[in-house]
Amino acid sequence: AYIDSVVLDGVNLGAIDSFRIAHIDADHTVEVIFAQYEYTISSFTNGHVTVAPVLGDTTVVYGSNVNYTFTVDDCYAITDVIVNGESVGVVANYSFTNVTDNQTIEVVTEVVTYTITATVNDEAAGNITPAGATTVVCDGTQSYNIAAANGYYISDVLVNGNSVGAV
């Protein structure tokens, strides 16, 4: 806490830490008004995440404890949380304890991706396009063209090891 102001007989003397009343010949009132230091916690994101208690600036008083929680949108993941310029890793919440200075917290997200690996059991018998590993964003769509070589036919297609028939 700090001295916000000193009031002597209804007159604000300002934020002083000492004064003297000389030649006292009447009653006096002295009021000292204290205030708590205030600090700002600034939170930022690159999007696709809800930050609680609030995204942006939060004012807290000296010694406060403040818990932040992060809830990502569907198909997004937290890739880092940065507090005062230092990574604290991939966390779903962070607590500031005994706040005595301004603070920053940033939540970094990215879209979730998946890898689809497409192969054929015998390359001489036909092909699948695109072949190999393909990266697809969450909730995305990937189409494949399957063609049998001359003299062959498609007997079965497996997706994650499960038959979907001769498509």
Task: Describe these PLM feature segments.
Residues 12-14, 40-59, 87-89, 117-136, ...:
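Short, solvent-exposed loop/edge segments of extracellular or virion-exposed proteins
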Residues 24-26, 62, 99-101, 138-139, ...:
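Surface-exposed loops/turns
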Residues 1-20, 65-95, 141-167:
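Surface-exposed interfaces of beta-sheet-rich extracellular modules
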Residues 6, 32, 41-43, 49-51, ...:
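Extracellular/surface recognition and adhesion modules
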Residues 5, 25, 53, 97, ...:
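First exposed extracellular module after export/assembly in secreted or surface-exposed proteins
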Residues 17-40, 92-120, 167:
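Conserved "repeat-terminator" motif of extracellular CCP/Sushi domains
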